[in-house]
Amino acid sequence: MTDSTRDGHASHSLHGGVYPGNLFMVVAPSGAGKSTLVNALLSKDSDICLSISYTTRKPRPGEQDGQHYHFTTVEDFRARHAAHEFLESAEVHGNYYGTSRVWIEEQMRNGHDVLLEIDWQGALQVKKQFRNAVGIFILPPSLDALEERLKKRGQDEPNVITRRLLAAGSEIAHASEAEYVVINENFERALAELECIVAATRLRFASQYARHTELFIDLGVHLPHAE
């Protein structure tokens, strides 16, 4: 999820928008603990908004429409895709997922940080449009641990678990494309590392400038010229 293009702007959209809010992308293979970590982070940090994706997959036990996902039909998803409503979209394990562009840009324009739970393919799509989006890859401590977590979760049939484990290898190979990597062996440590990443991002010059532009101008501090 890295990009060789760098400039002094925070959350710089290729469509011309420069927003004070930061965009975080959390990527992980199924079973690595991504959702649990993200939920814990959100419960401690009210300044981050979770982007709720659209999906054509069936709800899992306990999932609610509009809270965990916007559950929709294949026909509706394709219509939204044709209308360019999605910032990114992908097919994962036979189901479609998409992220609302309008909602994200509105939140960031108003100074809110936005977090995406996303796969690596979607993260690359987002990075092409928001060059300073921050990619965070969650890794399991081992493939054996990943398999054990998938079994304990009790949500998938054995053949689905096998398919997820096979996919995990190719997904993990893209960890090098992220700006940050968190190894989720100890939950509390992994959560603390996520919090550190968020805090460090907010303190970057570009983020501080976008949030406090008038102060920086009054002090005579200006953005560096893009190369």
UniProtKB/Swiss-Prot annotation:
Task: Kindly give the SUPFAM superfamilies that the UniProt entry links to this protein.
Answer: P-loop containing nucleoside triphosphate hydrolases
GO cellular component entries: cytosol
Listed A to Z, the keywords are: ATP-binding, Cytoplasm, Kinase, Nucleotide-binding, Transferase
GO molecular function terms attached to this record:
ATP binding; guanylate kinase activity
Enumerate the subcellular locations listed in this protein's record, separating them with semicolons.
Answer: Cytoplasm
SMART domains of this UniProt entry?
GuKc
- Which residue intervals define the domain Guanylate kinase-like in the entry? 21-199
Report the superkingdom from the record: Bacteria
Q: Where are the transmembrane segments?
A: none
Return the PROSITE patterns for the record. Answer: GUANYLATE_KINASE_1, GUANYLATE_KINASE_2
Q: Which reaction does it catalyse?
A: GMP + ATP = GDP + ADP
Q: What is its main location?
A: cytoplasm
Q: Where does ATP bind?
A: 28-35
EC number(s) for this protein? 2.7.4.8
Q: Pfam families, from UniProt?
A: Guanylate_kin
Family note = Belongs to the guanylate kinase family.
Function, in words = Essential for recycling GMP and indirectly, cGMP.
Its recorded name reads: Guanylate kinase
Species, as recorded: Burkholderia orbicola (strain AU 1054)
Gene, per the UniProt record: gmk
